[in-house]
Amino acid sequence: MISDSQIFVALLFALVSAVLAIRLGTDLYQ
């Protein structure tokens, strides 16, 4: 059983990792 807090944490973690991946990608691209 997945609770709402676990879904919120998973979404927040995915958002942070996506932002870090984009920033790292742009740094390597330039």
UniProtKB/Swiss-Prot annotation:
Q: Where are the transmembrane segments?
A: 7-26
Keyword Membrane assigned to the entry: answer is yes
Record InterPro entries: PSI_PsaM, PSI_PsaM_sf
Q: What is its main location?
A: plastid
Q: Which organism is it from?
A: Gracilaria tenuistipitata var. liui
Name of protein: Photosystem I reaction center subunit XII
Q: Name one GO biological process term.
A: photosynthesis
GO CC annotation: chloroplast thylakoid membrane; photosystem I
How this chain sits in the membrane, per its record, is: Single-pass membrane protein
Q: Where in the cell is it found?
A: Plastid, Chloroplast thylakoid membrane
Q: Which domain of life is it from?
A: Eukaryota
**Member of which family?**
Belongs to the PsaM family.
The UniProt record lists the keyword Kinase: no
| Record key words, sorted | Chloroplast, Membrane, Photosynthesis, Photosystem I, Plastid, Thylakoid, Transmembrane, Transmembrane helix
One Pfam assignment = PsaM
